[in-house]
């Protein structure tokens, strides 16, 4: 990724390291913008806080022989749709989460609030969202699609990730049942666009989400055709 630079008052271009010092003198909106730019640069280089938190969590789970699968935006990135995120979504069984907490709470991870599934990495200051096998995406109500067992995970970029089929299925079920999760439908469209997912994937999906996948796929195809 190209080095992100900041134009100084004198018209010269400052590298990001120097830009960090310059932003200390900017007003709050400008400072927030450049802090976000530095965060994005670190993220897309794979050296940011979120990547470090993910790798630290995954290596700990593997050392403890606790099955897991990275989900959410970090899984999207692993499959080829690059977008920034500020947290790590991880799939665990209920027993796996209990085992991890018993060994590691207070040792680099804390609960977000007493008894919460979610945690926070205290070394990287990154939120960890935990998805539990058997729970339901979207509105949380029983439905044909549920969070799978981590055993479905595949190895990708040094960590275990949800396969494309499961990731797409969960995001479609989430977006279809929770109006506050429309971005999950957008994620599916962007993944189709980024890696050219085939229409034939529809046959591997749960019947609950097949129509929506086909609808999004055809809309994305029409959009691409209109550009030429």
Labelled PLM ranges:
Residues 2-228:
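Compositionally biased terminal segments of proteins
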């Amino acid at each position: 990724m190209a080095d992100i630079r900041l134009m100084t008052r004198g018209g010269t271009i400052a590298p990001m390291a120097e830009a960090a010092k310059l932003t200390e003198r900017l007003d709050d909106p400008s400072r927030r913008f450049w802090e976000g730019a530095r965060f994005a640069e670190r993220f897309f280089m794979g050296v940011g806080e979120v990547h470090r938190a993910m790798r630290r969590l995954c290596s700990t789970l593997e050392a403890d022989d606790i099955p897991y699968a990275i989900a959410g935006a970090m899984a999207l990135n692993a499959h080829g749709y690059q977008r920034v995120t500020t947290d790590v979504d991880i799939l665990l069984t209920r027993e796996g989460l209990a085992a991890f907490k018993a060994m590691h709470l207070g040792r680099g991870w804390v609960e977000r609030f007493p008894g919460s599934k979610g945690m926070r990495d205290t070394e990287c200051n990154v939120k960890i969202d935990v998805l539990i096998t058997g729970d339901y995406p979207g509105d949380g109500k029983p439905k044909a699609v549920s969070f799978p067992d981590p055993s479905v995970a595949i190895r990708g970029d040094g960590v275990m990730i949800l396969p494309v089929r499961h990731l797409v299925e969960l995001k479609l079920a989430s977006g279809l049942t929770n109006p506050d999760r429309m971005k999950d439908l957008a994620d599916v469209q962007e993944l189709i666009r980024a890696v050219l997912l085939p229409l034939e994937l529809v046959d591997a999906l749960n019947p609950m989400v097949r129509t929506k996948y086909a609808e999004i796929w055809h809309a994305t195809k029409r959009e691409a055709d209109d550009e030429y």
